[in-house]
């Protein structure tokens, strides 16, 4: 099965290269797609330079998809998913710290071996703040592999912005698709407050949680509606 890694990135020029360096070392990947989500910094230039540097190597090719305006994480992920013909796609955040090739393989294998429709990477042993967040809400992890057609069929997924992971989780639960939670040791990511400063970081985090809440309410309602329709058919 063809496998593509998709890296949605917004203003990640200082961090994205270390993630790409790891992804190109994973033997299970056939291509890597960076989706530059309307960044205002040099994210596109860094990714394109990396792609050129590795073009002649035996590593999986890297290509950069530039979105003219910011569509949010869900929009960037959808753009990447529809830009490939890979049967399996894997999403990785552009600000990861401690990612290793074996982490990538561990997340991919349950899907490639036909055990599940989606595998979600859950941080452990990175640092307390991200470990705690993923213990409390592992279903919003951005590191996951899944069958591509199951992602692109989700209604409105391209409009979910930061709520994309909760939308994915609710949709898969509603459809009873099998999902595996895969522990990945030693990974964390750069916090918004570290990227933007305390005040702007807190505001960005608040906005992110609001988008997650909106997606939760929308897809939870869709789940309730489907359940009611099924009950009505059975009457």
Label every PLM stretch briefly:
Residues 2-4, 31, 167:
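Cell-envelope/extracellular polymer assembly enzymes that use nucleotide-activated donors
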Residues 119-133:
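Short beta-strand-to-loop element that shapes/binds the nucleotide-sugar donor at the catalytic cleft/hinge
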Residues 159, 173-235:
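Hydrophobic helical membrane-anchoring modules
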Residues 36-45:
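A conserved acidic beta->alpha catalytic loop
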Residues 101-120:
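Conserved donor-nucleotide/metal-binding helix-loop-beta segment in metal-dependent transferases, i.e.
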């Amino acid at each position: 099965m063809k496998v593509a890694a998709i890296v949605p990135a917004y203003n990640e020029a200082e961090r994205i290269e270390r993630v790409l360096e790891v992804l190109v070392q994973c033997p299970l990947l056939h291509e890597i797609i960076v989706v530059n989500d309307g960044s205002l910094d040099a994210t596109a230039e860094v990714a394109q330079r990396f792609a050129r540097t590795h073009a002649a190597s035996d590593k999986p090719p890297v290509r950069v998809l530039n979105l003219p305006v910011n569509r949010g994480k869900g929009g960037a992920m959808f753009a990447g998913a529809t830009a490939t013909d890979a049967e399996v796609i894997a999403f990785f955040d552009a600000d990861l710290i401690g990612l290793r090739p074996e982490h990538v393989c561990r997340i991919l294998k349950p899907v490639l071996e036909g055990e599940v429709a989606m595998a979600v990477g859950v941080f452990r042993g990175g640092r307390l703040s991200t470990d705690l967040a993923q213990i409390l809400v592992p279903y919003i992890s951005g590191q996951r592999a899944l069958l591509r057609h199951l992602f692109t069929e989700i209604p409105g997924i391209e409009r979910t912005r930061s709520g994309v992971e909760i939308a994915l989780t609710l949709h898969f639960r509603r459809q009873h698709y099998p999902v595996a939670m895969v522990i990945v040791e030693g990974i964390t990511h750069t916090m918004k407050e570290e990227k933007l400063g305390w005040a702007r970081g807190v505001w960005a985090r608040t906005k992110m949680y609001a988008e997650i809440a909106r997606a939760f309410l929308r897809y939870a309602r869709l789940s309730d509606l489907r359940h009611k329709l099924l009950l009505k058919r059975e009457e």
